[in-house]
Amino acid sequence: MTALGPKVTVQESPWDCLNFVSMRHDKKPFDDKRVRRALSLALDRYQGSTALSKIAIVKEVGGILVPGTPYATPPAELEKLAGYGHDIKKNREEAKRLLKEAGVPDGFAFTFKNRGIPMPYEPVGVWLIDQWRQIGLNVRQEVIEASQYHGLLKRGDFDVAMDFQCGFIVEPDLDLARFVSTSDANYGKHKDTVIDDLYSRQARTTDIEERKKLVRQIEKRLLDEEAHVIYTLQWHRIIPHLSKVHGWTITPCHYLNNQLDAVWLSE
C-alpha cells in the first residue's frame, strides 16, 4: 500500500456485522441477570477496540445499531450502559460484587463455545476469555466446526456461546428482530414482553424521533437492565482500490452497492 501511494484509495466504514455473546437463560447461573451483567461489565471495550482493530476486522464500540447511522446511540449516551463506561476498574469491581451476590464463587468455570472461523471469531473469543479471567472466572473455549455451529445454536447445545449477525441494510426492524421472545434466532431463549412490546411500537411509529426513543429503550433493556446478550465490537470494513476507479462508495453492508453500474475509470 505504501509503495503504491496515491495510486490507491482506501475507504472505511463501520460494518453491519458483529459478534455478540448469547447465554442460555434456562441454565444456571446464566439465568441470573446479575451474572450476565457481570460478564458485560468485565469487558474493556475501548482498550479492546484499540488492540483488536490492529489484528482483526473489528473496531467501533457500539450498541444495537451500527455506530454513526441514524438510529445509533451517541457515544456519550452509550457510555451510561453497563460495560460501556470508561472506568474499567470500577466496572470490574461491580462485576465481582454482582457475581458474589449471585452466589458465583471465585474461579467459577464454564465453557465458551465459538465458531470455527479464524476472523474475527478467534481473536474476539480469546479477548473475551481474557477479560472474564480478570473478574475471577475460569473459561475454557471450545471451537466448533463452522458447518456444525448454526445447528448447535439452534439446538441450544451451549451455556455461553459466540453469536453473530450481518444485516443487508441498517434498519431496526431487521437488526433487532432476533431479540423478540418468539424469534427462532433468540438462541439464549430469553422471554421479555417489554422488549416485544417496544419492538412492535418502534416498527409501527412514523415519527422518527419517537422511534429513536423506543430503540434506545430496547437497547437499555437488552444490554443493561436484563443483559440478555453481550455485544462485543462492531466489524469494520476496509476496502482499498485503485484511485483511477471512481463512482463507488463504501456502505455499512457488503451485500450492497456491488452492481458497479455507476463505476468508471479515469484512465
Predicted feature descriptions by range:
Residues R133-S147:
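Short, well-structured beta-strand/strand-turn elements
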